[in-house]
Amino acid sequence: MVIDKSIPKATAKRLSLYYRIFKRFHADQVEKASSKQIADAMGIDSATVRRDFSYFGELGRRGFGYDVTKLMNFFADLLNDHSTTNVILVGCGNIGRALLHYRFHDRNKMQIAMGFDTDDNALVGTKTADNIPVHGISSVKERIANTDIETAILTVPSIHAQKVTDQLIEAGIKGILSFAPVHLQVPKGVIVQSVDLTSELQTLLYFMNQNHLD
């Protein structure tokens, strides 16, 4: 199967949603799904579904629908969801603690293997109820040196985000999901995905206000 390497970011962001939909269809024992069924489940139009799928070659035949099991496995391969991906969490404040207790592995094959915070944080040296150890940030390089961990969730205050990012990159981290509302400078080969809760809420309020004006 030929995959177009120049996949738009908007399409890339929908990949996990497609995977979730096909897993749901599979659980409901749906064998074939049309682009309209997929679109309705996603809250988008069927033309967007067909355009997204076109980047991955021939996923289905027009008029026959899409094989649910085949597509579920395809997206599992694409998202590397056949094997468990271990990640670390850096910053055990309110958001960080909530994420430490979130059971990623119940929904996907991802799990937080370790938490990190400032060396003097009271949580350092303890474990969560799910047996996740919390370490001091100064030990991050040695802690992940002999592991397969390349991904970090960053939930530190904005003023510390860049410094901690530099430490993570030096330790070998290649991907960062950042909750800090600042732009992070990273070298080529390191990917940052930002989650700005304030921005998302403001966007929601904007669209709500637009609805009131209509």
From Swiss-Prot:
NAD(+) binds at residues 91-96. One of its GO terms (biological process) is negative regulation of DNA-templated transcription. The keyword DNA-binding applies. GO terms for molecular function: DNA binding; DNA-binding transcription factor activity. It is found in: Cytoplasm. Keywords: Cytoplasm, DNA-binding, NAD, Repressor, Transcription, Transcription regulation. InterPro entries: CoA-bd (IPR003781), NAD(P)-bd_dom_sf (IPR036291), Rex_DNA-bd_C_dom (IPR009718), Tscrpt_rep_Rex (IPR022876), WH-like_DNA-bd_sf (IPR036388), WH_DNA-bd_sf (IPR036390). One of its GO terms (cellular component) is cytoplasm. Residues 17-56 bind DNA. The keyword Transcription applies. SUPFAM superfamilies: NAD(P)-binding Rossmann-fold domains, Winged helix' DNA-binding domain. HAMAP family: Rex. Belongs to the transcriptional regulatory Rex family. Modulates transcription in response to changes in cellular NADH/NAD(+) redox state. This is Redox-sensing transcriptional repressor Rex. It comes from Streptococcus pyogenes serotype M4 (strain MGAS10750).
